[in-house]
Design a protein with these regions (language model features):
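Mature-chain termini and adjacent capping regions
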Residues: 1-189
Length: 189
């Protein structure tokens, strides 16, 4: 009789341990699925256009892209061919374009990468070759401050000359540019 009770106790313990193992295994699998699902995008977009206005109701900035993918877990939006129209205090529109862009929601920044171009909208719409342009490989645009920064090499071309530098800060709302290092300029009036 004692052996039957011992055998019954052993079988009950084995079944209990087996059920606990199955629960732990399925919980781990479910958690992995939830984590991998949160890394997936929640929407894709074609022809993105986003406008921001000042408190007075004036257009401050417009962001456009041919394609966008939003990742909610990272609070990140990837943009293809982003184009930013930033309007300065005098009403002039500056255009920032690149091949790729990454909008970080928490930092309120837009990182433009690959063939970044900054130029006045008037020149882009004129149909003539650009007379004033700024080129670099990467530029971080701080959307709230209307400020753009890079630590990469920069080339500024104008009708009268050329400036090469490493790093710059552009205050788009004030039309001011500060070059950070290795500045070389050529001017021909």
């Amino acid at each position: 009789m004692l052996r039957k009770r011992f055998l019954l106790l052993f079988i009950a313990a084995a079944v209990g341990i087996g059920l606990l193992w199955i629960e732990d295994y399925t919980t781990a699998q479910t958690q992995e699925n939830i984590e991998s699902a949160s890394l997936l995008p929640d929407y894709y977009g074609e022809g993105l256009r986003n406008r921001s206005y000042t408190e007075e109701g004036k257009l401050e900035r417009e962001v456009m892209a041919s394609h966008s993918i939003h990742y909610p877990a990272q609070k990140l939006t990837e943009l293809d061919e982003p184009k930013v129209h930033s309007i300065d205090n005098d009403g002039e529109t500056w255009v920032l374009t690149s091949i790729l862009g990454f909008h970080y929601e928490e930092r309120k920044t837009l990182v433009l990468q690959q063939d970044v171009l900054v130029t006045p909208l008037v020149e882009l719409n004129s149909g003539t070759p650009l007379q004033n342009s700024i080129r670099t490989t990467e530029l971080t645009f701080y959307t709230e401050e209307q400020l753009a920064k890079t630590d990469k090499p920069v080339e500024v071309l104008s009708i009268n000359g050329q400036i090469n530098a490493v790093g710059m800060i552009i205050r788009l709302d004030q039309q001011k540019i500060e070059f950070l290092s290795q500045v070389k300029a050529r001017y021909a009036p």
